[in-house]
Amino acid sequence: MTKQDLMDIIVKVAPGSPLREGVDYILDAGIGALIIIGYDDEVEKVRDGGFLIDCDYTPERIFELSKMDGAIILNDDCSKILYANVHVQPDNSYSTTESGTRHRTAERAAKHLKREVVAISERKKNVTLYKGNLKYRLKNFDELNIEVGQVLKTLESYRHVLNRSLDSLTILELDDLVTVLDVANTLQRFEMVRRISEEITRYLLELGSRGRLVNMQVSELIWDLDEEEESFLKDYIDDETDTDSVRRYLHSLSDSELLEVENVVVALGYSKSSSVFDNKIAAKGYRVLEKISKLTKKDVEKIVNTYKDISEIQEVTDEDFSAIKISKFKIKALRAGINRLKFTIEMQR
């Protein structure tokens, strides 16, 4: 099962969802429950006894039905309660690491049916989610708050480091002093920020409606990440290389592999060797030019396709810009924008 499978389950039991409301009723009452989400022929084969309910789901109804010993079966979107008080008999050949009867049955049923199963422990007062070989215990609100706070601080720190790295890179680009190592270090930081933001997404799903404030903070930190990375990659990879393929390669690296900058250099089309670190490399100019609001994407493409890099673009005369149909107003905005960018970065240092 994939991370997406885990997220799909968490969404169904996140605070604010109808199913979670019913689960909370069950937890507060100090009773347990086993809930199977979805029904098909395979579920019918493992269903023994119980009785047909076939009514609309409400938190109150599932709470009342959980007072009986058997499992509860819901439809795929949890909008209907199909069966209650069911004895579930999954194939015992499926292994389980659980100790309690309810959780052993839940884990085996999830593996057998390839469906989502929710087990609520009356003794430990916790909720465990299963699907296939996937198993995940929901954290309580206090645990989540602590962990989210830690991850959010890490994201803020890494985003700050990335921003400083991009500022330094901008000055190097304008002075024509960029090396392969400078670019690889920045690309490495982009991927680190992306991974931390993906990690916090799972926490936000688990927080559900309680995570609105954190969600706003995360959105503020990463709102321009994709666009900034796209411009950055277009500056340094050759025209035949797809930016998505670079991202896929970086995503395939383990955390420890990502920390080795030699692996990141490969994404830029260089050999996996430190000997290339000091090689000079020039930015085409996408990232810098796209920060100048008066230039359209068409203008940026025209300039980048005409001149080889941002260093050369700074030396182009007004007449040469006019020759490629860049207006005097935009030429002035371009020059002022680059000077303002330099000044702003220097003031922030």
From Swiss-Prot:
GO MF term set: adenylate cyclase activity; ATP binding; diadenylate cyclase activity; DNA binding
Taxonomic superkingdom: Bacteria
Listed cofactors: Mg(2+)
InterPro entries: DisA (IPR050338), DisA_sf (IPR038331), DNA_integrity_DisA_N_sf (IPR036888), DNA_integrity_scan_DisA_link (IPR018906), DNA_integrity_scan_DisA_N (IPR003390), DNA_integrity_scanning_protein (IPR023763)
Record bears the keyword Oxidoreductase: no
UniProt xrefs under Gene3D superfamilies: 5' to 3' exonuclease, C-terminal subdomain, DNA integrity scanning linker region, DNA integrity scanning protein, DisA, N-terminal domain
Segments forming domain DAC: 3-143
EC category name: transferase
Signal peptide segment: none
Record-listed ATP binding positions: G70, V88, T101, R102, H103, R104, T105
Record-listed E.C. numbers: 2.7.7.85
Catalytic activity, as annotated: 2 ATP = 3',3'-c-di-AMP + 2 diphosphate
Entry function: Participates in a DNA-damage check-point. DisA forms globular foci that rapidly scan along the chromosomes searching for lesions.
Record text on subunit structure and interactions: Homooctamer.
Matches recorded under PANTHER family: DIADENYLATE CYCLASE, DNA INTEGRITY SCANNING PROTEIN DISA
Protein name: DNA integrity scanning protein DisA
Originating organism: Fusobacterium nucleatum subsp. nucleatum (strain ATCC 25586 / DSM 15643 / BCRC 10681 / CIP 101130 / JCM 8532 / KCTC 2640 / LMG 13131 / VPI 4355)
